[in-house]
Every structure is written in C-alpha cells, then in structure tokens.
C-alpha cells in the first residue's frame, strides 16, 4: 500500500510539472516578410529561368516549405494588405482598392480588428517596419491603433515610392507621428535596421514582426554600390538592352531600369538573409516561424520590365490583372524543428487565411465570422482540416474585374458602366497560362461559377469602393 501511495504521489507530481511546463511554454515567434510587387517568377526557387539570383530566398525554400498555389488578397497594395490583416476576402473587406493619401475611407475602421491586435492580446510584442497602407497617423487605422507596439516606415503607398524621403512615421509615446529622415539614406536600410533592433530587444519574449518591405516597387532606385553589382566595369548594364525611363508622375528617371530592378530584388534577398542570420545568431531558430511572400504580382511602372525578367513565370498577367500573374505569389515558410525541409505543397490558400493560420500556430483565438481558414496543418505535412470551396477577388480600375477559382476552373468577369459584361473561363490544369477562353464551350460551368461569384460578395459598406454604378 505504501508503494502504491508513493507511485501515486510521483505520478501526480510528474503530471503537475508537465502541465506547468506546457502552460509556461514559450509561444513561437512569428516573422512575416512581405515584398512589394515581387512576381512569382522573380524568386529563383520558384522560377529556375529567373535572371536575378536570390540565394537567400532559395536557401529559405530549401530549409522550409514552398507553396506553389498561394494567392494574394488582391492585385494591388492596400486591399491585399487589408485581406492579410483582417481575414476577409474582397467580397467582404472594408478596403477593396487603392486610394489617395489622407483619404479616411481608405483606412481601417475601429471595428476592423487586425492580426496584430489579436496577437498582442495573446501576449506578443508586435512590430511593423515598412509600408502600412491602411491608415494615416490621424485615422482609426493608424498603426498604434491597430495592434502594433512598434512601427517605423511609410503610411501610404504613394509616399512609399520615394526611397530617399525626408520623413517617415514612427510610434512614439504610443502615437504614430512623423519623424525626420536624412535624405541621403536609403529608406530600405533604415527600415531593416529598425527590424533588427526590434528582434534584439524582444528576443526573450514572444514577438510578431511584420516586415512589409518596399522593394522592388517603383520607383526603380537603389544606392550606387548596389547598382554596381549589375553593371560591368565600364558602367554598362549586365542586362541589355536598356531603355532609359524618363521621369513620369511620382517616378524619377532611371537610365538603367533593368539593372536597377535586379539590384532591388537582390537587396530584398539580402535583407531576408540578414533577418534569418540574426535569428540563427540569437538561438531563436527553433522558436521562430518565418513567412515570406509578396503583396501582388509584378509591376510595370517606372521602367520595370516584367516580360524581360519573366517576372510572372509561366503565368499570364501582372499587377492590376486578375489573371494568375497578378494574384499568385510565392510563399515560403521556414521553422526548423517544426517544418520538414524541402517540402513543396500545391494546396491553394490565400492572404485571408493567414490570420487564422497564425492564430492556430500561436494559440490565439480566431473570430468565427471571417472568411479565412487555418491551413497550419500543411506546415507539418498534413492536410488542412477544411478547404475553401472557392476563392474570390474583385478589383476596380478601368472598370470592374472579378475572378473566382474552384478547383482547376477559373472564371473572370469584366464590366464597365453601360456595357455588357464579358466572361472568360479557363481550366488552370490544362491551361496554366490562361491562353484559351473556353467559356462558350462550357456554359454549365460558367453558370455554376457565376452563381458562386454572386454568392461570394456583399455590397461594399465603404462608399469609396461602392461599384454599384458600374453594374448599370
């Protein structure tokens, strides 16, 4: 009897210690790196024919999992980031398009709870460094009101075109304020340095680092020493023929746009390497998930040449298109000890799934009413508990565009005010380049997908993105 009591006491103690250890277990750090206008084909591990070396991203791919059918929230900046932060598709999101700076309707509302707010509520230190795009300093969408303890960077996409600006924004004293910047400094360097400081300052506690870098978005401008990597000794470009870009709108002139774009992608790759090296140096490798993706497809502004660089890979379209090239983006996730290296996964998922996925990884509660689903099981080689029936996007510049995918089928709708709609149907398995519109040959499929397209959206509550007039 005495031995039985000893065994029970030992077992009870062991269980108590195990529970205490589980309860006290450190939540994983999460680093989410978001490139700006980087095409699927600009990452060498996603496109072996890429002209630009990306050794750090390739290494990240080797050490983690590569998703080959991951979708952005939209085909331009602000709405894509809205989907990422809130978990809503373009059929339900508050921000469904880009807008000018200081436009209050382009900012998140108080009730639009973000990923950062949820993680902060679960004990995470939260930092963002780069381009926000979802609210100015005096709006309800300012970074300090959307869950970030630290922020340094740009508030709107127009300002973010300037890589040698005289001002950025920072959270100081609990508020987002303008801070002066030395115009001889390349802002990408300043932003990455702040991210490094944030990691060092929070290495002993769970942190969420959101790093929405601004490269390789136009304008095509880099420091001379970075440009030299893609120039011959005589100063000529390693990527001829070059067509000089003359200043237009917000974008400054660039004599060698090919070399400059390559240098910007290389800079992005180097910055990713800096973050990964720091995590290793601090011994945080086994406690940290690193995500890398892009906000939409490649741009063609400011002298950029996505055709020359095969920036969309095998896909049709670029930024502002709802063809695959405008919305299919690279996704790499690395977490040694948690994610087996060298995986390739073709499961489709999207920006609005990031919030619930990170929620499950971190033990953070996820709201029931959002569009996103958790795909965290994919990271450990398992199947998702639930898949989406379909994926939906809408975008309005030069008329309304909508797209919906279901399995291998994809329907795209074009509509301008006063004109009849145009429908295009593609089978992505048979025609990944979306070259052959087979809508006329498949009326039943068109009808079924069209019905889902109506089901996937509600009229926008935001008058800035109310496109009901276009439907007339």
Annotate each predicted stretch with a short phrase:
Residues 11-15:
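Repetitive helical segments and hydrophobic/amphipathic motifs
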Residues 2-9, 20-424, 428-472:
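Formylglycine-dependent sulfatase
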């Amino acid at each position: 009897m005495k031995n039985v009591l000893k065994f029970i006491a030992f077992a009870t103690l062991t269980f108590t210690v195990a529970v205490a250890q589980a309860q006290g277990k450190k939540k994983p750090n999460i680093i989410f790196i978001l490139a700006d206008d980087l095409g699927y084909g600009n990452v060498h591990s996603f496109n072996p024919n890429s002209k630009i070396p990306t050794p750090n991203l390739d290494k990240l791919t080797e050490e983690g999992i590569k998703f080959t059918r991951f979708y952005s929230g939209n085909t331009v900046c602000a709405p894509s980031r809205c989907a990422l932060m809130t978990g809503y598709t373009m059929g339900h999101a508050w921000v469904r398009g880009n807008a000018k700076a200081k436009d209050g309707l382009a900012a998140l509302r108080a009730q639009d709870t973000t990923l950062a707010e949820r993680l902060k509520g679960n004990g995470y230190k939260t930092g963002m460094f780069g381009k926000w795009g979802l609210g100015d300093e005096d709006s309800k969408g300012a970074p300090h009101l959307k869950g970030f303890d630290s922020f340094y960077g740009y508030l709107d996409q127009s300002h973010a075109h300037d890589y040698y600006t005289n001002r950025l924004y920072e959270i100081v004293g609990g508020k987002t304020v303008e801070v002066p910047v030395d115009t001889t400094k390349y802002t990408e360097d300043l932003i990455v340095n702040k991210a490094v400081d944030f990691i060092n300052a929070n290495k002993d506690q769970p942190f969420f680092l959101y790093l929405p870098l601004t490269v390789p978005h136009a304008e095509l401008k880099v420091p001379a020493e970075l440009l030299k990597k893609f120039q011959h000794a005589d100063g000529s470009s390693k990527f001829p023929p070059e067509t000089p870009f003359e200043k237009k709108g917000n974008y400054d002139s660039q004599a060698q746009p090919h070399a400059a774009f390559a240098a910007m992608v290389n800079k992005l790759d180097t910055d990713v390497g800096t973050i990964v090296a720091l995590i290793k140096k601090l011994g945080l490798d086994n406690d940290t998930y690193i995500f890398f993706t892009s906000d939409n497809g490649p741009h063609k502004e400011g002298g950029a040449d996505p055709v020359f660089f095969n920036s969309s890979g095998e896909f049709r379209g670029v930024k502002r298109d709802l063809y695959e090239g405008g919305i299919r983006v690279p996704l790499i996730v690395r977490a040694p000890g948690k994610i087996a290296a060298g995986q390739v996964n073709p499961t489709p998922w999207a920006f609005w799934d990031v919030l619930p996925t990170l929620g499950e990884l971190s033990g953070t509660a996820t709201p029931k009413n959002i569009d996103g689903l958790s795909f965290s099981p994919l990271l450990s080689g398992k199947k998702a508990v639930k898949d989406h029936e379909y994926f939906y996007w809408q975008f309005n510049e030069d008329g309304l565009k909508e797209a919906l995918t279901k399995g291998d089928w994809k329907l795209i709708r074009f509509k301008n005010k006063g004109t009849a709609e145009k429908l295009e149907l593609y089978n992505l398995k048979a025609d990944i380049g979306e070259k052959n519109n087979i809508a006329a040959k498949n009326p039943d499929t068109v009808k079924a997908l069209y019905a889902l397209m109506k089901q996937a959206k509600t009229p926008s509550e935001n008058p800035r993105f109310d496109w009901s007039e276009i439907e007339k």
